[in-house]
Amino acid sequence: MIFYLHGFDATSPGNHEKMRQLQFIDPDVRLVSYSTLHPKHDMQHLLKEVAKQMKHSDDPSPLMVGVGLGAYWAERIGFLNGLKSVLINPNLHPEENMQGKIDRPEEYADIANKCVSQFREKNTHKAMCIFSVNDEMFDNQQLASELSAYYSIDWDDVQPHKFPQLAAHLPKIKAFKLA
């Protein structure tokens, strides 16, 4: 089972395409949607929804995959549920870069402060990151340096921020899920 968490653009047709591509790894791909506008509510909703979905699966190695803001949540929700995560062009600092896009971006800082202290140290090797060299949204070199002590980092020379084509990375994602 793969949980797919969309980015800030929840209605992008690319989300369906990424889910279809992920079905080459596991036919059971589930979209876990969230508002993107209310971080505290989103966190509670995602925790409940993932726990509910996991009760109805016998997959020994479920995986969370998120793009952009979805990767922010995939890392945290995955950690809190003991799941591996794939973070694609993760938005690591929505409290800074979501100003003007959502009502209360400061809630992300509050979530970070309330999360398990040093959770990345406790989550080491339980996530893999895929970064676009040509990400038009974020400085991925900086973000990769924040995560490289904890997670493996893969680079893509072709894909933009929304990462419409996962094909080149599907074998690594599958190996990570099954390892």
UniProtKB/Swiss-Prot annotation:
Pfam families in UniProt: UPF0227
Family annotation (InterPro entries): AB_hydrolase_fold (IPR029058), UPF0227 (IPR022987), UPF0227/Esterase_YqiA (IPR008886)
Transmembrane segments: none
Similarity section: Belongs to the UPF0227 family.
PANTHER family: ESTERASE YQIA-RELATED (PTHR35602), UPF0227 PROTEIN YCFP (PTHR35602:SF2)
Protein name: UPF0227 protein Sbal223_1944
Protein species of origin: Shewanella baltica (strain OS223)
